[in-house]
Amino acid sequence: MVLMIVSGRSGSGKSVALRALEDMGFYCVDNLPVVLLPDLARTLADREISAAVSIDVRNMPESPEIFEQAMSNLPDAFSPQLLFLDADRNTLIRRYSDTRRLHPLSSKNLSLESAIDKESDLLEPLRSRADLIVDTSEMSVHELAEMLRTRLLGKRERELTMVFESFGFKHGIPIDADYVFDVRFLPNPHWDPKLRPMTGLDKPVAAFLDRHTEVHNFIYQTRSYLELWLPVLETNNRSYLTVAIGCTGGKHRSVYIAEQLADYFRSRGKNVQSRHRTLEKRKP
């Protein structure tokens, strides 16, 4: 059974995540004090029900040791996983402005910007321990729920999931990435008028990139690096490894290379997911 702990900065989508987990059959509790986690788990263990609990800045323990103690007291039947939701500062400010809700720390005479920064510092012990960090800056409510369903229901039990995502540097680096590779030095299909409207998923773009030795060398050396360290990462109690590939716009080179890497590790029997941030933004 799984005990999913959902945390993250206010406005990042914790309530949405908890509702999505409830739809997946999790027994959900909002803002349960950390010290009560073992009691909840023992109660649900006999019923063989997985649980999801949200923890925000209001019910954070005074020290990381209290959280670690609660985790160590969980029944053996439960496998704890920590999901941390985040978004960039400007997105959080915009969301609060749109909803006109008060930030949980605003009552301490802090401005919204200061409250967001203070909360980030207070939640850092949980963020650093997270099994999965999700950047919701560019996600709608429905996209976040669907992504969680895909990652949580699609993942094999106790196996590391490799996530390959493409992005454009002009849109910013994904904050959920464990590794970031820059491919802006590779030949750019953008300068071919026939290829410009296409993406790295289209065969003519793939054929263009496939003709260049440096593209093959980069893919080979990147996958070799990941293969070298993958056994260590798999034994390090991780659930996800997110590898971000970036080019200028996130449309051609990064998409192609992310797909090549995903296909390679998928062919090796790994649990693999891929996503393309720029292409997802362009969907109607």
Curated annotation (Swiss-Prot):
Instruction: Write the protein's name.
Output: RNase adapter protein RapZ
Q: Which UniProt keywords apply?
A: ATP-binding, GTP-binding, Nucleotide-binding, RNA-binding
Give binding positions for GTP: D56, V57, R58, N59
**Family stated for the protein in its record:** Belongs to the RapZ-like family. RapZ subfamily.
What does this protein's UniProt record list under function? Modulates the synthesis of GlmS, by affecting the processing and stability of the regulatory small RNA GlmZ. When glucosamine-6-phosphate (GlcN6P) concentrations are high in the cell, RapZ binds GlmZ and targets it to cleavage by RNase E. Consequently, GlmZ is inactivated and unable to activate GlmS synthesis. Under low GlcN6P concentrations, RapZ is sequestered and inactivated by an other regulatory small RNA, GlmY, preventing GlmZ degradation and leading to synthesis of GlmS.
Give the domain of life. Bacteria
Keyword Ribonucleoprotein included in the entry's annotation: no
Record-linked InterPro entries? P-loop_NTPase, RapZ-like, RapZ-like_N, RapZ_C
Quaternary data: Homotrimer.
- Residues that bind ATP: G8, R9, S10, G11, S12, G13, K14, S15
